[in-house]
Amino acid sequence: MSSMEGKKVPQVTFRTRQGDKWVDVTTSELFDNKTVIVFSLPGAFTPTCSSSHLPRYNELAPVFKKYGVDDILVVSVNDTFVMNAWKEDEKSENISFIPDGNGEFTEGMGMLVGKEDLGFGKRSWRYSMLVKNGVVEKMFIEPNEPGDPFKVSDADTMLKYLAPQHQVQESISIFTKPGCPFCAKAKQLLHDKGLSFEEIILGHDATIVSVRAVSGRTTVPQVFIGGKHIGGSDDLEKYFA
């Protein structure tokens, strides 16, 4: 597998299903006059793809856009129904799911490999690339090792290439409940600092049992930053002081 850096992406047409209609999408539509990140993987719903590869690109999408990226595409040798179901399951609204059902794009990239040992048939090798106006500027291709290596095609590696000066924000989670004024205060503090966070809403995403299990407390909000328990809204205020 060799790099396609400096070359144009293959010209193919992807057969997609949007609602109840078939819609053909060409590589020209996806790449012309745009800066696009593509990451490709062996298959929808597979463990590494679903737990690490896809979620991190979705999480960092606002950061990538800040640095001039127009779109982020995930390409897999799967049909459009599988890719649509995977998108719905993952709730990755910042990513465009591209079904390379016949493997034409992947083969044109030189990344089509045999996964017959897993019963997969022909699939994509794992890689990522930055494409500007249809020309590949940079590729990160996983090493040719047994199994499914995941070392260089991740979102953080791409971000370091695109914006080496960027300081990656620590992950933030906050337990809240509807109508809680202290929760609203804590969320506003985070917004004022320009920090993104994941909100876990009691009664919808979890119960007070989870709050007690991870924080030892029975009140909300409870804020966690970078694996550290900060506490409630007053604690968060002190943390930022």
From Swiss-Prot:
GO molecular function terms listed in the Swiss-Prot or TrEMBL record: thioredoxin peroxidase activity
Listed Pfam families: Glutaredoxin, Redoxin
Active site: C49
SUPFAM superfamilies: Thioredoxin-like
Enzyme class: oxidoreductase
Disulfide bonds: C180-C183
GO cellular component: cytoplasm
UniProt similarity note: In the N-terminal section; belongs to the peroxiredoxin family. Prx5 subfamily. In the C-terminal section; belongs to the glutaredoxin family.
Subunit structure: Homotetramer; interconnecting Prx and Grx domains of different monomers.
Listed NCBIfam families: GlrX-dom
Its job: Thiol-specific peroxidase that catalyzes the reduction of hydrogen peroxide and organic hydroperoxides to water and alcohols, respectively. Plays a role in cell protection against oxidative stress by detoxifying peroxides.
UniProt-recorded name of the protein: Hybrid peroxiredoxin hyPrx5
Organism: Haemophilus influenzae (strain ATCC 51907 / DSM 11121 / KW20 / Rd)
